[in-house]
Amino acid sequence: MSASNITLTHPTAFLLVGIPGLEHLHIWISIPFCLAYTLALLGNCTLLLIIQADAALHEPMYLFLAMLAAIDLVLSSSALPKMLAIFWFRDREINFFACLAQMFFLHSFSIMESAVLLAMAFDRYVAICKPLHYTKVLTGSLITKIGMAAVARAVTLMTPLPFLLRCFHYCRGPVIAHCYCEHMAVVRLACGDTSFNNIYGIAVAMFIVVLDLLLVILSYIFILQAVLLLASQEARYKAFGTCVSHIGAILAFYTTVVISSVMHRVARHAAPHVHILLANFYLLFPPMVNPIIYGVKTKQIRESILGVFPRKDM
């Protein structure tokens, strides 16, 4: 063995298994995965193009939606191309530093998505509870600051992880029992004391999910109070109708996060592929359904999409 290999504390590459125990079904599993990824790409790119092209959609709600679409594109594209390469071509190898980069992007953009969903809840709160101050509160400057804060929080919380993982000696082999480089899946291969990584990873996840979800719920408590005080049922229906798309996006994101986290800790003796499939569902489902939710439930988006197709006079 050469001297350069002896000094390495980490392998030059990892091997991603895919879905443990279901390797013989990879080609079939790839079909819904590929379909979901294609829908995510088409849907989110369409949202971005329409919001950019239509000046009437350059409002706070749609600017936050554009942020969400961009995040969903990066989030799904960070894992799905490599995942499909595993399923189709058995291309399981991933460079050590590419693995760390993938892990950083996946976890960072998940945190950014949570922040943007919280910002969208704040947008709905101001629109319904303080409608006369909406344009004064949600200025372009504030929206930019919110976007920068979402990025800064995610990068600050996730930057330590790649550096911590570089310090470990990986004596348990290079095989990761996963479809992508998830933090805890990589930590399991490391020797030595990994307790700080374990605690830090869980603490960050709990902090983000609990804090953001509580603030979202609090926003909707105030929104519900304001809606119930409206004079007519039609006004109440119209006001709350503007929140339906956001509630759908919230449920799509947090439900999958919570189910995946609970199953990972409660059903520890479940087959490995159950946890991996749930983790993939969390990665695929929100980016796929968010454009559909907003396209169907938001009149301005729906009209902009239909306006792309020329109508023939009868």
From Swiss-Prot:
Lineage, top ranks: Eukaryota, Metazoa, Chordata, Craniata, Vertebrata
Residue positions the entry lists as glycosylated: 5
Residue spans crossing the bilayer: 28-48, 57-77, 102-122, 142-162, 199-219, 240-260, 276-296
GO molecular function annotation: G protein-coupled receptor activity; olfactory receptor activity
Highest taxon of the lineage: Eukaryota
UniProt family annotation: Belongs to the G-protein coupled receptor 1 family.
One Pfam family from the record: 7tm_4
Disulfide bridge map: 99-191
Name of the protein this chain belongs to: Olfactory receptor 52K2
Stretches assigned to the Extracellular side: 1-27, 78-101, 163-198, 261-275
Entry's Gene Ontology cellular component terms: plasma membrane
Localization: Cell membrane
Residue intervals annotated with topology Cytoplasmic: 49-56, 123-141, 220-239, 297-314
Topological relation to the membrane, as annotated: Multi-pass membrane protein
UniProt keyword annotations, A-Z: Cell membrane, Disulfide bond, G-protein coupled receptor, Glycoprotein, Membrane, Olfaction, Receptor, Sensory transduction, Transducer, Transmembrane, Transmembrane helix
